[in-house]
């Protein structure tokens, strides 16, 4: 009996010997991550890392909103600004897999009216152009207005030329376009007969057990919505305002085009799970999200021969190719910012690494195009999960 106790004690000591360094390593990483959030004046934030198909690290910092002082947690929904485009892009790729959409079809076919740059009437505008930001749209047009009607702005019969660059042939020039991303949402509604948020929930989010929405009112736990703050820490959007934002759960492509620009609300772990899908073969937790061919297409550069796009765009299907985040490695993903929001989702396929950075307000300084806070957090992930430097 004494011998058995002695053996059990030795086993327990051995287990503790392994566990203690691991715990110490995680505490050290927590401290490093917290320091980045602190130095960036973040009100609240989240950093999630996944590798080899599983979430391996997550850290939540600060508060959801200053009035309630509720801490940020894995249950917090963040508004993810332009990362909305990448998530919408995954939904669009799924529709392409299913044969509902063709990336090279004239979008007029889907919208039910003729969309043309009046200076290039023989050149159709395609979904591929919209998703690579090469459609030649004017970004400072009336699309930003809450009452603008989409068809009034792009239907050639309504003399909508002011919303196009009249000296730029569609497909020939890269120019980042929020408006173009909005049009893709209108296409989803026109084709499916459903509002874009409900369609994405039904076809993409629900099968994965993800609670996310383009309308705050559709979320299961709206009490967990993070406020949005300006760079200086002042309030920009309260959760109560987001819940009151006008949104009708029926197809209204002439109006709902605004939501796919940047209104998605999602929890950090769920965004990381979508990242796992596009980092690998299109599956997550055994569920097929998109085909492996679709994942490959999101990473491939366009060419004139295969796609009819002559522009040198860093985006393919709302996915940017980025070569400066990790040393000697290419990552794919998207960045989002709106006032003080920072949201980044990047995947690095060689090491099967996914990183998610989300804040509800912080310093939005950039280094070589990428948010400084994201570069600093990515450096920690690179150090630990790629280089294996654990202190």
Stretches with model-predicted labels:
Residues 26-78, 100, 158-164:
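Short, conserved catalytic-motif segment at the N-terminal edge
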Residues 1-11:
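Bacterial N-terminal signal peptides that target proteins for export
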Residues 342-361:
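Short, well-ordered beta-strand elements
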Residues 20-25:
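Sec-dependent signal peptide cleavage junction
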Residues 11-19:
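Bacterial N-terminal signal peptides
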Residues 38-46, 68-129, 166-179, 259-262, ...:
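Short active-site loop at a secondary-structure junction
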Residues 361-391:
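Short, gly/Ser/Thr-rich active-site loops of penicillin-recognizing serine hydrolases
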Residues 65, 119-337:
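Short, surface-exposed loop or secondary-structure junction motifs
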């Amino acid at each position: 009996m004494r011998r058995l106790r002695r053996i059990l004690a030795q086993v327990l000591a051995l287990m503790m010997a392994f566990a203690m360094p691991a715990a110490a390593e995680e505490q050290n990483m927590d401290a490093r991550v917290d320091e980045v959030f602190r130095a960036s004046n973040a009100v609240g934030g989240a950093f999630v890392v996944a590798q080899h198909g599983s979430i391996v690290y997550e850290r939540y910092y600060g508060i959801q909103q200053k009035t309630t002082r509720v801490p940020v947690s894995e249950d917090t929904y963040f508004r993810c600004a332009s990362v909305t485009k990448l998530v919408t892009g995954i939904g669009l790729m799924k529709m392409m897999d299913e044969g509902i959409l063709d990336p090279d079809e004239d979008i007029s076919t889907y919208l039910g009216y003729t969309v043309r740059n009046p200076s290039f009437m023989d050149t159709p505008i395609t979904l591929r152009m919209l998703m690579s930001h090469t459609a030649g749209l004017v970004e400072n047009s009336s699309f930003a207005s809450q009452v603008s009607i989409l068809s009034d702005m792009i239907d050639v019969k309504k003399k909508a030329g002011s919303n196009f660059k009249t000296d730029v042939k569609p497909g020939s020039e890269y120019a980042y376009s929020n408006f173009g991303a909005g049009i893709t949402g209108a296409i989803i509604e026109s084709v499916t007969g459903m509002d874009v948020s409900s369609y994405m929930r039904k076809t993409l989010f629900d099968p994965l057990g993800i609670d996310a929405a383009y309308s705050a009112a559709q979320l299961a736990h709206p009490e967990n919505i993070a406020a949005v703050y300006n760079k200086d820490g002042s309030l920009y959007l309260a959760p109560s305002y987001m819940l009151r934002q006008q949104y009708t759960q029926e197809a209204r492509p002439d109006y709902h085009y605004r939501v796919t620009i940047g209104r998605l609300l999602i929890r950090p772990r769920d965004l990381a799970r979508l990242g796992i899908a596009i980092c690998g073969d299109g599956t997550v937790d055994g569920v097929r999200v998109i085909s492996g061919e679709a994942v490959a297409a999101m990473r491939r550069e366009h060419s004139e021969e295969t796609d009819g796009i002559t522009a040198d765009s860093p985006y393919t299907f709302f996915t940017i190719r980025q070569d400066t985040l990790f040393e000697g490695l290419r990552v794919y993903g998207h960045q989002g910012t709106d006032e003080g929001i920072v949201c980044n989702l990047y995947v690095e396929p060689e090491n099967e690494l996914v990183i998610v950075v989300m804040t509800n307000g912080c310093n939005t300084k950039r280094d070589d195009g990428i948010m400084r806070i994201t570069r600093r957090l990515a450096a920690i992930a690179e150090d630990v999960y790629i280089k294996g430097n654990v202190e």
